[in-house]
Amino acid sequence: MNKSTSTLEYIEKLPLPAEQAEALREKFSASQDLSSLHQALSDGSVVTMQSPDDIPLVSVPRRLELAWEDGLNGGKQLGKDREGRTALQAMPRITRASMFPDAWQTNPMVRWWDMINGRSKPLRHHDKTAEENEAENRWRRVGTLRRYVLLLLTLFQTAIATWYMKTILPYQGWALIDPFAMVHQDVWRTIMQLLPYVLQSGILILFAILFCWVSAGFWTALMGFLQLLIGKDKYSISSTTTGNEPLNPEHRTALIMPICNEDVERVFAGLRATYESVEATGELDHFDIYVLSDSNDPDICVAEQKAWMDLCREVGGAGRIFYRRRRRRVKRKSGNIDDFCRRWGNQYSYMVVLDADSVMSGECLTSLVRLMDANPRAGIIQSAPRASGMDTLYARCQQFATRVYGPLFTAGLHFWQLGESHYWGHNAIIRVKPFIEHCALAPLPGEGSFAGSILSHDFVEAALMRRAGWGVWIAYDLPGSYEELPPNLLDELKRDRRWCHGNLMNFRLFLVKGMHPVHRAVFLTGVMSYLSAPLWFMFLALSTALQVVHTLMEPQYFLQPRQLFPVWPQWRPELAIALFSTTLVLLFLPKLLSVILVCAKGAKSYGGVAKLFISLLVEMLFSVLLAPVRMLFHTVFVVSAFLGWSVQWKSPQRDDDATPWSEAFARHGSQLLLGLVWAGGMAWLDLRFLWWLAPIVFSLILSPLVSVLSSRAGLGLACKRAKLLLIPEESDPPRELVATDEYFRRNRERKLDHGFMHAIFDPSINALTSAMATARHRFSRPIEDMREQRVNDALSRKPQDVDCNLRLALMSDPVTLARLHHRVWSQPDTHSDWRSHYQTLAAPVIKSAQ
């Protein structure tokens, strides 16, 4: 291939109007090389070049204008670095703020010693006016009283249930055991006497803890039901505005979306739907959008940049929609948000944190801003996201559950917590100034798996905001906030693995100075969300062991040397059934109350009353089948976190997010084996006891089957057609979700795969990636040598053998990117393996709109 042919092929790749393309073909049909074409495309500005292969840098502005002219804000987005290279202004000018964390003092004894020695540091706290104190004290007194009521109800209910449990257990002779007399008798006899009572004591303790946990959830749901049934909430944060007040022009809001190796097409589809919804309210001037990327996959990074430019072009969002990719991924998501606050936080009064799958309506966002304006003591206002958008059977069950039962628990949380509530890390508005001043997160001291950067940052940030005197509220009755759920059980468990470790880490902050009691309780409930799994497993294991002892060992009727009457093991099935029924009521009554509430307000959007109750039964069946499976996985997560083990989840790519049988048996095989052994052992030992364990053991035996079938979109869509597991967001979808689905479909059609190779070969993508790369240093011989070494290293390999780190280094430097681009085009025979690999890629040709 000669130079003229290569040049003509390059012209064909440019998104030129037909007349301009023909003129260039005529001009370069002779032997002119590619460098002359770049010079012809340049704007005449001077670019410092250390190598002839840097020549593509001069044509970057023109190539960008050809592909994304409407996305460059009339050229205002283009700037120059100190060497004259084109730099795309993807972020506004930096106005730095100081954001530093206070070191954690997790040892109360050390803190007490510092206090008596005068070394204690006062906490940074916001001073409130007398009026603000009076307004806050009103709801704080109510909240405190309500929490005492919750505590009394939970403890009273637990005490009664534990007493019943004690009377049910077969061995009732603890009072007759004399440890001093046992010292002089045979050791084996002592063990035989004590073992049943030790097992029973363990069972009783675990039962009390678990029942208390269930009871707290029951009372939370019940209060939420009453709150929603009445429909009037004097202390609702949403009641503080009428909803039509003009937004304060001095209070601007940033919508920030931290992402990391996400589905690019879905991210920017939801972002566009949110942007257009805000625009429809007429309040767009009060908002800016930031995409904050921590992605480290080069293909995804290039796809993100192109998707951002496409979005800016299509909605006219240049100068309002910004994009940044961090080089140093410090402290994960919380560090990404902190970096934004340090650089641009001073420019905004509020920020709304979005997840990669978040969609929010313009009405919801403007309402959150109005609530912040109306409540100057509110630091965080959390919306209640509604799950939607997934089609697998598993996700549809979860969507139905969160949509039907979720409002009860969210309203119940608000009832008990009021302005000392949760923050879930997304779909919430935050007051930026106090967040900068008080919510920077120091790493946890020490070594091991529970030290270092905090993983679950949201609960901690809410606790710090409240410690500083700012309110944290849940706007549980505010519509227009949406999210998506994991499509299958294994994907959910990957997320739970991170959350489990993060919540266990957070518990180290339980005794930190100044934390509000409610947020100490939040740390405790966060731990119990996962610690309840091994406790439940231990409860079942001890119950099984007690049954083994009861069946195989001869009972010890006489526990004292001169005991006149034997102690008979007893069994009171009527009390056991009553207690079992009571526990089921606590677990399932909130679900029934949720359905009653839906019926009272109209069940048409759920498929009608009959379909709603059938859906309830289907969801309850799934919850029964999946609860033991989650129990075992969460038990492994907790144990591995305490032992410092790393649990690896490397799932293969799956079509439609379906779980293949091979992965299901790999993940659930041990549970299947345990279920078979457990069931077989109990059937051999005592068939009657097997019926009590049947929901557990048969769920474990069926776990691979349930995991695979529930991950299938076909079954989920069949339920949707039958109007089962239907939610209002499907029967009458809001325009934001309809728009998200449409934009997602369009984005899929123009999806950019193999982004790194396109950044090397495609003129438009190369120009974009080059303009968004940064070269912070002026000419330096060591830097030039390093650049040349990287380029030669890459070209000496096959393209598929270039590792991720080298790809990131190449695409992050405009000079190395230009050299690679020029060499593979100007020396096609020398680098034929690169060209042939690019030509065989399955990705469609990138065509940018004129």
From Swiss-Prot:
Which principal EC class is assigned to this enzyme? Answer: transferase
Q: One of this protein's Pfam families, by short name?
A: Glycos_transf_2
Q: How does it sit in the membrane?
A: Multi-pass membrane protein
Question: Which cellular component terms (GO) are annotated to the entry?
Answer: plasma membrane
Q: Which CDD domains match?
A: Glucan_BSP_MdoH (cd04191)
Give the GO terms filed under biological process for this record: glucan biosynthetic process
KW Lipid metabolism (keyword) present: no
Q: What is its EC number?
A: 2.4.1.-
Task: Please tell me whether the keyword Transferase is annotated for this protein.
Answer: yes
Q: Which residues cross the membrane?
A: 148-165, 203-225, 521-543, 577-599, 612-634, 689-711
Matching entries from InterPro entries are given as: Glucans_biosynth_gluTrFase_H (IPR023725), Glyco_trans_2-like (IPR001173), Glycosyltr_2/OpgH_subfam (IPR050321), Nucleotide-diphossugar_trans (IPR029044)
Keywords associated with the record: Cell inner membrane, Cell membrane, Glycosyltransferase, Membrane, Transferase, Transmembrane, Transmembrane helix
| Involved pathway(s) | Glycan metabolism; osmoregulated periplasmic glucan (OPG) biosynthesis
Function of the molecule: Involved in the biosynthesis of osmoregulated periplasmic glucans (OPGs). Seems to be required for pathogenicity.
Q: Tell me the protein family, please.
A: Belongs to the glycosyltransferase 2 family. OpgH subfamily.
* Name assigned to this protein: Glucans biosynthesis glucosyltransferase H
Taxonomic source organism? Dickeya dadantii (strain 3937) (Erwinia chrysanthemi (strain 3937))
